[in-house]
From Swiss-Prot:
GO biological process: formation of cytoplasmic translation initiation complex
Entry keyword set: Cytoplasm, Initiation factor, Protein biosynthesis
Superkingdom of origin organism: Eukaryota
Residue ranges the record marks as coiled coil: none
The protein's name in its UniProt record: Eukaryotic translation initiation factor 3 subunit M
Pfam families on file: eIF3m_C_helix, PCI
Length: 384
């Protein structure tokens, strides 16, 4: 794919023409001298502060503005490391200027930022600041979906760039804030969990508010049924002894009776944290059903209704909803009043579940070996 540039030519020639272009739009302090192979990096850096004409001056065609910013980004890739470290913060700071009435013109910033992020060496540390700027620009324009924000990929990039813990925390916080601003709560929770995972026993105290915020967000989401990963994080463990931790623990390993006892002691907890009692009870019933379904082939209607705190006539609609939410896979035997379990999803996934998975895989491998041996014998018999 060819990249649009301001003019064809060497980097020195491009910077010379860039200076002329910017001078024609008010950058009078730039000189008219020709750039050389020796000084073009310094001259390029001088031009950065005047790049805002690309989105402020309506007389510049949007295509020309995009070509200018793209040319600058492509030349950044050729900069020596020491000049790149100097140039990137200035460039990012300038692109974060969102002054001007025409928000559409700011969209030209995304392509050069992406070009720069992907064009630099994966281990280049300035990619960290470029990605931060990319997130903020995309969030301000409401197009965060145009930026790759998959947490696993972001974590890999941060590792490649050799970012400090503090820098990683800044990225995850920025991602969380951007997702929240755009109403993407599920993605915000994912970013927050990665943020909380960067804290240890010593620094966990600094993440107290974020930990509480994450717990409440997870509990508010009716489709999030796995809580043990968050529960194990140091900032969440730091909250032990506080009502929010006690309440969250109910959804990890508690039941409806524990829930009722908690509300008796803390009657205002739900309203203070914008939690619905009905939604919490429904989620807790789903989690209880998941736990009941582990390692069994069937459940009687009576047993299930008793454990879930439901009337018999309320059970079938609840089970159908649980299947829809993928909390359990089952069939209903309405004649014998039984729930036939065809697939169960563990409420928590700890050491017992890993051991069970290991044993199952070993058993499968053994069975496959038997099948392979039988097929080999059949082939030999047919050949003879």
């Amino acid at each position: 794919m060819s990249i649009a540039v301001f003019i064809d030519g060497t980097d020195a020639q491009q910077v010379t023409e860039l200076k002329k272009f910017l001078k024609s739009y008010g950058a009078k302090v730039l000189d008219n001298t020709e750039c050389s192979d020796a000084n073009w990096p310094d001259e390029l850096i001088k031009c950065i502060k005047f790049l805002n004409v690309c989105w402020k001056d309506e007389s510049i065609a949007e295509s020309d503005a995009k070509d200018v910013l793209t040319s600058v980004a492509s030349m950044f890739i050729q900069l020596p490391p020491n000049k790149l470290i100097e140039a990137v913060p200035l460039f990012c700071e300038k692109l974060l200027d969102f002054s001007g009435d025409n928000i559409r013109r700011h969209k030209n910033k995304l392509f050069p930022l992406n070009l720069l992020f992907w064009g630099l060496n994966p281990k280049s540390h300035p990619r960290y600041e470029i990605f931060l700027t990319l997130i903020e620009c995309a969030e301000k324009m409401g197009v965060l979906n145009e930026v790759i924000t998959d947490p696993k990929k972001v974590a890999s990039w941060l590792s490649e760039c050799d970012c400090t813990v503090e820098e990683c925390q800044k990225v995850w916080q920025k991602l969380y804030d951007a997702h929240i601003a755009l109403g993407e709560n599920r993605k915000a929770i994912e970013a927050m969990i990665y943020l909380l995972s960067t804290y240890n026993e010593v620094t966990a105290v600094n993440a107290r508010q974020n930990a509480i915020k994450c717990i409440i967000s997870v509990l508010q989401d009716p489709c999030l049924l796995s809580h043990d990963q968050l529960y194990a994080l140091k900032p969440v463990q730091y909250l032990e002894g506080e009502p929010v931790h006690d309440f969250f623990k109910i959804f990890v390993s508690g039941d409806l009776n524990t829930f009722k006892n908690f509300l008796a002691k803390h009657p205002n907890f739900l309203s203070h944290n914008n939690l619905s009692e009905e939604a919490c009870v429904h989620k807790l019933r789903l989690l209880t059903l998941m736990q009941l379904s582990e390692n069994v082939n069937e459940l009687s209607y009576h047993e299930a209704a008793t454990q879930l705190g439901l009337k018999i006539e309320e059970l079938e609609p609840f089970i159908i909803e649980a299947v829809r939410q993928r909390a359990v896979a089952c069939k209903l035997d309405q004649v014998q009043k039984k729930i036939l379990i065809t697939g169960a999803f563990p409420r928590t996934f700890g050491r017992p579940q890993w051991i069970n998975l290991h044993d199952t895989l070993v058993q499968w491998r053994s069975h496959l070996g038997t099948v392979q041996s039988s097929l080999s014998m059949m082939i030999q018999n047919e050949s003879s």
